[in-house]
């Protein structure tokens, strides 16, 4: 007589297969390899409760966590990218845009508008890396420029939260023009003696970092964000030299004065409000 019996393999006693678990219910943290429930991440502003690793946040999540509840008003939602170059590849530019619009619920890689932060009126633009690596095309550049110009006209601060792989190759020179356009709008905002707070998140690179992301009166970054122009691999292959430890991280750049302060995501809202009040009556 068998001492041990195999568990039943059929009927109602069958174990739930791994494939029956909803996709995305759990996330493995790249920082500590712990498995974290999606609900726990949402409640913790997408910060790992074990090691404080900062997962990517959507533009909508960032606005909800920073601005006063119900105060955000979106601007320029009708702007759409066009395939002026008729770009051809493994997929057309139009097809790629449609794919990311469906997966993110966004029209393009930035969400812009205005609202209040601890009662302070602000204009805001937030990049979303989930949309084509938050590359900057003509719509992204135009929406950011209009957000800046709205802030200047209303004499309120502008906050830009960056995360980007750089200029959008599908739009060629039109994407590169946005670097000058956004920078020009910020120069006029500065001439009006109005505050601009730039927040760098992981990753902020290339044309975005070389333009508006690095022009803030106050530049903050989330911990361990990758920040730079070209990637470390490209630089190493070009220079044939080993790079310093921590090269192109927020901590490395803070030590050298490019970043004013590294701020944990859960402390961003009060820290931004503190800086805006410090920067003078125009921010109040």
Task: List where the protein language model places each region.
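N-terminal alpha-helical interaction blocks
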Residues: 1-17
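An N-cap/entry alpha-helix motif that binds or orients negatively charged groups
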Residues: 11-16, 27-28, 55-112
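Cleft-lining beta-strand/loop regions that shape enzyme active-site pockets
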Residues: 109-190, 197
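Cys/His-rich microdomains that often coordinate metals
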Residues: 35-36, 54-55
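Conserved catalytic cores of soluble enzyme domains
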Residues: 165-283
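Residues immediately within or flanking Cys/His clusters that coordinate Zn2+
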Residues: 26, 45
């Amino acid at each position: 007589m068998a001492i041990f019996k195999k568990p039943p393999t059929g009927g109602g006693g069958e174990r739930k297969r791994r494939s029956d678990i909803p996709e995305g219910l759990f996330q493995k943290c790249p920082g500590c390899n712990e498995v974290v429930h999606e609900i726990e991440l949402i409640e913790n502003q997408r910060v790992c409760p074990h090691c404080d690793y900062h997962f990517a946040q959507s533009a909508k999540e960032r606005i909800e966590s920073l601005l006063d509840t119900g105060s955000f008003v979106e601007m320029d939602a009708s702007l759409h990218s066009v395939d002026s170059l008729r770009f051809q590849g493994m997929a057309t530019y139009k097809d790629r845009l449609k794919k990311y619009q469906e997966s993110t619920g966004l029209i393009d890689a930035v969400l812009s508008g205005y609202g209040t932060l601890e009662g302070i009126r602000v204009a805001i633009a937030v990049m979303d890396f989930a949309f084509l690596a938050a590359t900057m095309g003509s719509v992204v550049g135009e929406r950011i420029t209009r957000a800046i110009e709205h802030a200047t006209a209303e004499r309120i601060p502008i906050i830009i939260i960056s995360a980007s792989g750089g200029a959008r190759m599908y739009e060629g020179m039109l994407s590169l023009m946005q670097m000058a356009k956004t920078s020009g709008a910020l120069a006029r905002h500065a001439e009006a003696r109005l505050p601009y707070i730039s927040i760098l998140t992981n990753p902020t690179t290339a044309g975005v970092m070389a333009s508006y992301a690095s022009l803030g009166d106050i530049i903050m970054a989330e911990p361990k964000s990758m920040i730079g122009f070209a990637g470390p691999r490209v630089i190493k292959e070009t220079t044939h030299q080993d790079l310093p430890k921590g090269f192109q991280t927020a901590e490395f750049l803070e030590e050298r004065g490019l970043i004013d302060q590294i701020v944990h995501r859960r402390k961003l809202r009060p820290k931004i409000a503190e800086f805006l009040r410090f920067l003078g009556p125009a921010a109040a």
